[in-house]
Amino acid sequence: MPEKALVTLRFGPYSSSSGLVDHRVSRLQGLRAVLVSDGHQVILEEILDRNTVELIVNGELVFRCNIKELDFGGDGQLDPLCEEARKAVKDAY
């Protein structure tokens, strides 16, 4: 994969501790930071699938996880899911 890929980060709504279901980017900060630090351009796209995060590279789904499993905030360096996503984008073709 080229060093500077265009990555579409698709994310669905999830319920917060208050019980409200909405699209929020706070759990995506680390994932986004990891991808941007690797030189990728990240585009956020809201989807309707609840609790879902998907990474699309060249029109291909390369990674999917539950948004609630991502660490809240931070730089993503200590989040194992962020490392898994980084590897999936790197290995995309």
From Swiss-Prot:
**Bilayer-spanning residue ranges:** none
Which organism is the protein's source? Xenopus tropicalis (Western clawed frog)
Q: Which InterPro entries match?
A: UPF0728
Query: Superkingdom of this entry's organism?
Result: Eukaryota
Family per similarity comment: Belongs to the UPF0728 family.
Q: Name one Pfam family in it.
A: UPF0728
Give the protein's recorded name: UPF0728 protein C10orf53 homolog
